[in-house]
């Protein structure tokens, strides 16, 4: 029973770590006042956008497509 509880705790910790790792690769790309979001990018995609002169900011996946986010985009345009 004790081993089962420990195994379940480890699985929960791993699940949280995977979610956080996935969220790191969501980012917002801005160029000449136009911003859009990328969530399914590859790891090196952030570097490629930066090299091209884009303003790249990491955004946690939970904040995507909320009303507040849309209002911020309207202010920038």
Curated annotation (Swiss-Prot):
Modified residues (Arginine amide): 40
Major site of localization recorded for this protein: secreted
Gene Ontology cellular component annotations, sorted alphabetically: extracellular region
Disulfide bonds: 26-39, 30-35
Residues of the propeptide: 41-77
GO biological process, one term: defense response to bacterium
Biological role: Significantly inhibits the growth of Gram-negative and Gram-positive bacteria.
Entry's localization field: Secreted
Top-level taxon: Eukaryota
Taxonomic classification: Eukaryota, Metazoa, Ecdysozoa, Arthropoda, Chelicerata
Keywords: Amidation, Antibiotic, Antimicrobial, Cleavage on pair of basic residues, Disulfide bond, Secreted, Signal
Tissue: Hemocytes.
Family: Belongs to the tachyplesin/polyphemusin family.
Signal peptide residues on this chain, from the entry's feature table: 1-23
Organism of provenance: Tachypleus tridentatus
Listed name of the protein: Tachyplesin-1
